[in-house]
C-alpha cells in the first residue's frame, strides 16, 4: 500500500501539473474541480502541503479568484475562507498539519484593490473571526485566531493589521501600561479549563471593548479579564474586569 501511495504521489508531484499554467487555460470552476479530483482519494494529511501549493497557484493565477467562493475546496479539502467586514480583504487558511494532536495552518491575505491576484502569507493561527475599526481614516483589521499546540494546549490571539503600500502590516494599537502591541495572546490549557468555559478573548459588539482572559501563574483562568477600551489612537488598557 505504501508503494502504491508513493507512486501516486510521485505522479501528482510531477503533475503539480503545472497548476499555474493549467489554470490559465480553463475556468476557475474547472481548475477547482481538477484539484478536488486530484486529491479526493488520497490521505489528506499525506498530501495537504501539495494541496496548499496548488490552491495558492490557482488563486494567484486567476483574476476571478477574489469573487469566487471555492465550494469544493472548502467542503472537501478543508480550505477556510474569511472576509473583512469592508469586503476589501479575503483570507484563506489551509490545514498543513500532520494529522496528529498538534495543529498547523497556513494563512494568506488577498487584496481586492490589488492589480494582481497576489497573496500575502500571514503569521496567524487558524483564523476564527475578523473585525474592523478605524484609526482616523485608516481601517484597522482585528484578526482572532487559535494556535493548536496539541489536544490539550493552545494559544488564542488577537492581531491588529493595517494596509500600507498594498500589503498588510502590523498595527500597534494595543496600549498596555508600559508599551504598545500589535498582538495579544493568551494560553489555553485543558487541565484547568477542559470545557473551555467562556471566551478567552471577548470583543464587544460595538468593538469599543476587548477583554483578555486573565490567567494566574499556573495558566489557570481566574474568571477575570484584562480590559482594553477603544480610544482615538487604538485600545487603551484600563484595568481588570469580570
Predicted regions located by residue number:
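Short, solvent-exposed coil/turn segments at beta-strand boundaries
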Residues: 83-90, 111-114, 132-140, 203-209, ...
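Surface-exposed loop/turn elements that mediate protein-protein interactions on large endomembrane-trafficking
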Residues: 60-70, 106-121, 162-172
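Residue-level detector of short, conserved catalytic/binding motifs and their immediate flanks
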Residues: 88-90, 159, 226
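Bacterial Sec-dependent N-terminal signal peptides
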Residues: 1-30
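Short N-terminal edge-element motif at the start of the domain
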Residues: 90-133
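Exposed beta-strand-loop-beta-strand "reactive/processing" segments of non-cytosolic proteins
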Residues: 75-97, 139-147
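Short aromatic loop motif centered on NTY/YTY
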Residues: 128-136, 145-149, 154-157, 169-231, ...
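Start-of-domain marker
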Residues: 23-89
Amino acid at each position: 500500500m505504501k508503494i502504491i501511495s508513493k507512486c501516486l504521489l510521485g505522479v501528482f508531484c510531477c503533475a503539480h501539473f503545472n497548476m499555474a499554467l493549467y489554470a490559465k487555460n480553463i475556468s476557475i470552476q474547472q481548475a477547482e474541480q481538477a484539484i478536488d479530483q486530484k486529491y479526493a482519494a488520497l490521505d489528506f494529511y499525506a498530501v495537504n502541503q501539495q494541496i496548499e501549493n496548488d490552491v495558492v497557484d490557482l488563486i494567484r493565477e486567476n483574476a476571478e479568484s477574489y469573487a469566487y467562493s471555492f465550494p469544493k475546496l472548502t467542503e472537501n479539502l478543508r480550505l477556510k475562507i474569511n472576509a473583512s467586514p469592508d469586503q476589501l480583504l479575503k483570507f484563506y487558511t489551509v490545514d498543513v498539519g500532520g494529522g496528529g494532536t498538534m495543529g498547523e495552518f497556513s494563512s494568506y491575505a488577498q487584496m481586492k484593490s490589488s492589480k494582481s491576484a497576489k497573496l500575502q502569507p500571514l503569521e496567524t493561527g487558524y483564523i476564527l473571526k475578523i473585525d474592523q475599526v478605524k484609526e482616523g481614516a485608516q481601517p484597522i483589521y482585528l484578526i482572532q485566531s487559535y494556535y493548536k499546540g496539541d489536544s490539550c494546549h493552545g494559544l488564542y490571539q488577537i492581531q491588529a493589521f493595517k494596509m500600507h503600500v498594498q500589503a498588510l502590516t502590523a498595527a500597534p494599537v494595543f496600549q498596555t501600561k508600559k508599551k504598545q502591541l500589535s498582538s495579544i495572546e493568551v494560553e489555553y490549557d485543558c487541565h484547568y479549563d477542559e470545557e473551555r468555559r467562556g471566551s478567552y478573548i471577548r470583543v464587544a459588539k460595538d468593538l469599543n471593548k476587548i477583554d483578555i482572559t486573565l490567567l494566574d501563574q499556573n495558566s489557570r483562568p481566574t474568571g477575570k479579564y484584562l480590559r482594553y477600551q477603544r480610544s482615538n489612537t487604538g485600545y487603551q488598557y484600563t484595568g481588570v474586569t469580570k
